[in-house]
């Protein structure tokens, strides 16, 4: 069976930690492909100011262009209305029903995962992979959450310690506003694109 993963996010901007997560997932789960999906209008970020979707899409495209096992989809940014994870996963599952799908998201989502729209259906469509930003440690509350999800949905949450650098898109945007160096946080072409388009000033 073919294994593929979806890695969603606002990618505002995309940075090296995103790339590291994708590479780690490729090896860990024997994936044929990781599909990067820039978020359209996620319900939990409605009020947050975001860089226009076509610009975020272009940055992701530049960041992954040399890796044949990475691809990008504009499904969410072209879809009308709110960008629900269920709708995205359903779309890809219907396109490739025989593929074994993984959905990769951050550890911070674990606390409100059970409140996601159509979470039952999401667990039926894919394997849920949680990655840690600072080196994964199974704290007591995380262990309880895992057990709760296993009992309720009969699905095991997979965890991935990707040895991720301490990088976030918010940190990058703030450093740019402050006139600080950020080139080492992202692929060179993304950095040049940000400079050329005077982003995050």
UniProtKB/Swiss-Prot annotation:
Its EC number is 2.7.7.18. One of its GO terms (molecular function) is nicotinamide-nucleotide adenylyltransferase activity. Keywords: ATP-binding, NAD, Nucleotide-binding, Nucleotidyltransferase, Pyridine nucleotide biosynthesis, Transferase. It catalyses: nicotinate beta-D-ribonucleotide + ATP + H(+) = deamido-NAD(+) + diphosphate. Catalyzes the reversible adenylation of nicotinate mononucleotide (NaMN) to nicotinic acid adenine dinucleotide (NaAD). Pathway: Cofactor biosynthesis; NAD(+) biosynthesis; deamido-NAD(+) from nicotinate D-ribonucleotide: step 1/1. It holds the Pfam family CTP_transf_like. It comes from Clostridium botulinum (strain Hall / ATCC 3502 / NCTC 13319 / Type A). InterPro entries: Cyt_trans-like, NadD/NMNAT, Rossmann-like_a/b/a_fold. This is Probable nicotinate-nucleotide adenylyltransferase. Belongs to the NadD family. One of its GO terms (biological process) is NAD biosynthetic process. SUPFAM superfamilies: Nucleotidylyl transferase.
């Amino acid at each position: 069976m073919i294994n593929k993963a979806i890695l969603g996010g606002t990618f505002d901007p995309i940075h090296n930690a995103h790339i590291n997560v994708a590479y780690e997932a490729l090896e860990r789960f024997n994936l044929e492909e990781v599909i990067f999906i820039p978020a359209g209008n996620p319900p939990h970020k409605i009020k947050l100011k975001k860089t226009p979707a076509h610009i975020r899409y272009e940055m992701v495209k530049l960041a992954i262009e040399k890796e044949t096992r990475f691809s990008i989809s504009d499904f969410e940014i072209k879809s009308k209305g709110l960008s629900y994870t269920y709708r995205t996963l359903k779309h890809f599952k219907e396109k490739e029903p025989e593929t074994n799908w993984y959905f990769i998201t951050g550890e911070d989502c674990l606390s409100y995962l059970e409140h996601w729209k159509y979470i039952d259906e999401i667990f039926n469509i894919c394997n849920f992979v949680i990655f840690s930003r600072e080196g994964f440690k199974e704290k007591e509350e995380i262990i309880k959450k895992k057990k709760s999800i296993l009992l309720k949905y009969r699905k095991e949450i997979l965890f991935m310690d990707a040895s991720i650098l301490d990088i976030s898109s918010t940190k990058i945007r703030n450093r740019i506003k402050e006139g600080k160096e950020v080139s080492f946080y992202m692929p060179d072409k993304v950095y040049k694109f940000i400079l050329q388009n005077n982003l995050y000033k």
